[in-house]
Amino acid sequence: MPVYLSDNFVEFPHGDYTAHRFDFCIETHNFIVLFAEVITSDPEYHDYRSDEAGFKIPTRCYDVKFDRLENFERGNFYEPPSKSQCSRRLNFTDELAEALETIITLHHNVYRARAYLAVAETPKLKRFYDRVLQQPPHDVVYKVNAGLGEGGMGYVLKTQYFNH
């Protein structure tokens, strides 16, 4: 069962914006989830990201990423754990999906996010996202766009606040 190590989102500066961090663990595996608002103040970058997403990205849309905490601390992002560090439990990925859904729902409720953008950095992560997003949390996500961006590894989750 996931254990949420953060009581609230930790806010920290990220360029002109404030990013949000939430930590959790499953068994002995520590994870971090980061939310960074998509930059809309730079017209060239905003156009690039909007083209990638397939719509003009409004404010309050967030890039969301998660990784193992040790990868984040070492700067070797998305590196899989060694075989000896992998969980052997069959329901580990279900618990991981539950934790991510809970944290995204909490973020949505606190920050009234309009959309979340994510990129599956590895084929294994893409398979995980594809499986999880077959049944997104409908109280938060009303539309999922998958297969976006370079290599079709990108996702957009539009929320109930998207048109507000």
Task: Please place each PLM-identified region on the residue numbering.
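Non-catalytic substrate-recognition and accessory regions of acyl/acetyltransferase enzymes
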Residues: 1-164
